[in-house]
């Protein structure tokens, strides 16, 4: 149900930009709904990816354990390279990119809580797996937004984690006994039918910080919930990164690894990036036709999230029909959520009959 609401709230990244631009224009009325989504006629008339993609049109992800400085490095890399920075997708990522950008209640965001996971990871109400399932969907949505931006503008993107590294948390949760084997099977089923449609990043940057140092940083940060994270859980995350994620990604893309000290020198990291040849991975096999189909997919957020809801009964992520109907109607009553963006009078939309 929550994923259904995520689909309802998700809109094309380019459509969001168009709508925002239309709201800023003064004078002659212009509609945020006028521009048609990219389609076959655009392609046939010459709007092709090869015209805007350059050697700097790259997808870069920055990965690492909790509190390793991923956000700082990703932001600095993006600024130095002239790329667009995508901060790590959290529970409220769909909220931040739709409506007024304000976080909605838990009922509309997977009914999960990161704070509760840290406080009670073995909670018998299924919060741990609901959280992981929802975060995968949020990262999937963000990755589609990043690819859409790349294919639409040609500008490179830098993300903090991605759908390709999300599983490290699932592995750690299962190893620590936080979730059941059935949850792992459900996750892998969803992942297998969604991730196959997406190209991996051109480059993965991994910040390697030992678990004791991670714990020291967590304590220094002072978040009362994060301070309850065990060293065993952090070690399992690190193991999943080093034993599975990095070996797999090294076959698909470039990989750079840095220590905590080395990662602080973003200038040196950028120099290393510029020396890379980017001579491996599926991006090299793409042409205008395949990138056309990829762009069609990533601009359609309903299709992006379609297979995150699969017909498998799992108590952790399943709710009854009556509750589904109630939450859906409550969601539709929220300001700006009843109709498509630009058609809701309660949030100030005007000239609706001309759109």
Curated annotation (Swiss-Prot):
Q: Which UniProt keywords apply?
A: Electron transport, FAD, Flavoprotein, Mitochondrion, Phosphoprotein, Respiratory chain, Transit peptide, Transport
Q: Which residues carry this modification: N6-succinyllysine?
A: 285
Needed cofactors, names only, are: FAD
Q: Name one GO cellular component term.
A: mitochondrial matrix
**SUPFAM superfamilies for the chain:** P-loop containing nucleoside triphosphate hydrolases
- Is Transmembrane helix set as a keyword in this record? no
- Which InterPro entries does the protein's record reference? Deoxyribonucleoside_kinase, DNK_dom, NDUFA10, P-loop_NTPase
- The transit peptide segment here is 1-35
**After translation, how is this protein modified?**
Phosphorylation at Ser-250 by PINK1 is required for the binding and/or reduction of the complex I substrate ubiquinone.
* Free-text remark on how the cofactor is bound: Binds 1 FAD per subunit.
Q: Where in the sequence is Phosphoserine found?
A: 250
Q: Name one GO biological process term.
A: mitochondrial electron transport, NADH to ubiquinone
Cellular compartments annotated? Mitochondrion matrix
What's one Pfam family the UniProt record gives for this protein?
dNK
Under CDD domains, the record lists:
NDUO42
Report the function annotation for this chain: Accessory subunit of the mitochondrial membrane respiratory chain NADH dehydrogenase (Complex I), that is believed not to be involved in catalysis. Complex I functions in the transfer of electrons from NADH to the respiratory chain. The immediate electron acceptor for the enzyme is believed to be ubiquinone.
Which protein family is it in?
Answer: Belongs to the complex I NDUFA10 subunit family.
Q: How does it assemble?
A: Complex I is composed of 45 different subunits. This a component of the hydrophobic protein fraction.
Record protein name field: NADH dehydrogenase [ubiquinone] 1 alpha subcomplex subunit 10, mitochondrial
Gene source species: Gorilla gorilla gorilla (Western lowland gorilla)
Per the record, the gene is NDUFA10
